[in-house]
Amino acid sequence: MSFTAAFAQSPVDSKTTRLHQRILTLDTHADAPTMLQKEGFDVGITHDTKRDNSQIDFPRMKQGGMDAMFFAVYLPQGQRTPEGHAEAKRNALNQFRLIHEALKKYPDAAELATSPADAYRIEKAGKRAIFIGIENGYPIGEDLSMVKAYYDLGCRYVTLSHFANNAICDSSTDPDGPLHNGLSAFGRQVVAEMNRLGIMIDISHTSDKTFYDVLALTKTPVIASHSNCRALCDFPRNMTDDMIRAVAKNGGVIQVNFVSDYLRKPSEEYRQALTKMRMANVGRVSSPEQAARQQARTDSVKQVYRNERASLADIVNHIDHIVKIAGIDHVGIGSDFDGGGGVNGLEDVSEIANLTAALKSRGYSDKAITKIWGGNLLRVMSKQQPAK
């Protein structure tokens, strides 16, 4: 792995740099497809976060030493109707197309990965390993066959819900409260089908009842692709200590995200403003263009309240808490870059070595950091049982 001068100038000592170069770094939640949908955006060239809000591209992944990322095919929750599901499916398939086209355009920079072995092989070749996940089971609609269709396109995890309830399960943040009291009957079929295919079940964003329903049903370890600790930041989107223990008992992993308002509790004024923006399109069919405008409005709210932004230390605090509750084998990284992630000291993917340095400063061993940066997630992925 090679690093550019910009990486060398970051506040990371030579010993930590060598460690960062040696280990496989993996981020389970990157909303890069949101940027791919913007006209003229090219993931193969270097962008400036301050100029276009992009936090991920292939050159900056290489610059920062990010070996592997799950690009999240994200669908905002719309109407639970045939028309809404059809639009979500169209949107999802378009994002898969954009990811595959980007990989085809830059074969020397990045390659699709669908297994742990792929990640190690691609990293050894000096390229970026790009996995695919789906954030929000909404594009599955009520058609179980779509689970296999997305698997065939490279999907290796599905976040069952997002900010509102869908046909699969209840969300942790739907303002109308629960719809199914956890998993729906259809959601139980989806969990079984994901187990059959070897798709990781992602319980980030789901309600507490959904979470426990999934753990009672799944035959394989689960992931929380981008979730934090409720004990440190009291919000329904985060996980309680009992939930963290339950994930450990299941053999799964919790991937800490970099979203400020899930790391450190913001003011109630900011929370309400952000929730209002996030819920604005729930129940509506959103095109990629409409979703981009909604994201721009959300970004404007965050700019107004920018002084409440979290720091790199806050990320490590959540990692510390999970290790204390569940042990070193059940924590990882899911940044949510390009989807709200980013803190003071860690603005984009080019700066991820700063997290390695922060972990070293907190006393984590090289072995522990290797687990946090990808080893734990790849262990969970290897435990899935794909259909023969």
Named regions from a protein language model:
Residues 220, 229-230:
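Charged catalytic cores and adjacent phosphate/nucleic-acid-binding surfaces used
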Residues 9-181, 230, 234-388:
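N-terminal hydrophobic targeting/anchoring segments and the immediately downstream early-domain regions
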Residues 143-147, 210-220:
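Distinct, well-ordered alpha-helical segments
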Residues 179-195, 214-224:
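Alpha-helix-loop-beta-strand connector modules within alpha/beta enzyme cores
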Residues 1-11:
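Bacterial Sec-dependent N-terminal signal peptides
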Residues 34-35, 194-214, 329-335, 339-341:
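Extended hydrophobic secondary-structure segments
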Residues 189-203, 207-210, 241-249, 321:
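Substrate-binding cleft of carbohydrate-active enzyme catalytic domains
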